[in-house]
Amino acid sequence: MAGHSKWANIKHKKAAQDAKRGKIFTRLIKEITVAARLGGGDPNSNPRLRLAMDKAFGHNMPKDNVERAIKRGCGELEGVNYEEIRYEGYGISGAAVMVDCMTDNRTRTVAAVRHAFTKHGGNLGTDGSVAYLFKHCGQLLFAPGVGEAQLLEAALEAGAEDVISNDDGSLEVITGPDTFVSVRDTLEKAGFKAELAEVTWKPENEVLLQGDDAVKMQKLLDALEDIDDVQDVYTSAVLDT
């Protein structure tokens, strides 16, 4: 459903991220720090840290910044101790929304998240209210024009779970969260470079929003993304504006 909007949605997401590069650096440093604290400072034995470092270097973060974040996570440098929290709720037309945060002040964060939901026509739900509607997986999105047959063969040989052909001509490769890095690297060596590659929470069923509803939903998502403590926002909504 709503495959025709997939590429437009991804391009909007990338443009929004590029416009908030400073905020992205802050979020990536938090993720690297927490990943190192929980799993150690060696990316070869810590997949979460490896992903965070890959993303940081993909955004041209200086190596010194990355190394300092790892040292803070490992306790070699002093730093803020962040707590991971997930909030769940509903947006326009009941579209599911998950908000992943890292914070040193839970009270401040929940107040900001609740305010964004309330102001923009959504509702903050309880733990577990929408998480079951999403699948934790790796996602690689390829622009329209990539050879479907060749990508399908290469992806399945690399260990991907599925290859989805969207109505707009874009292709999605779905992996398990633990096999994402190996599939991505194998495909890149075979000449397939994804426009977007991430471990994400993919909705099991999408909700197509059009016109005013799509505009309202975008405002809610933007408001959540603008909160300093927010790391990622996931939604079942596909916006057709």
From Swiss-Prot:
Keywords: Cytoplasm, DNA-binding, Transcription, Transcription regulation. HAMAP family: Transcrip_reg_TACO1 (MF_00693). It is found in: Cytoplasm. Transmembrane segments: none annotated. Belongs to the TACO1 family. Its main location: cytoplasm. One of its GO terms (biological process) is regulation of DNA-templated transcription. This is Probable transcriptional regulatory protein NE0210. It comes from the Bacteria. It comes from Nitrosomonas europaea (strain ATCC 19718 / CIP 103999 / KCTC 2705 / NBRC 14298). One of its GO terms (cellular component) is cytosol. The lineage of its organism: Bacteria, Pseudomonadati, Pseudomonadota, Betaproteobacteria, Nitrosomonadales. GO terms for molecular function: DNA binding.
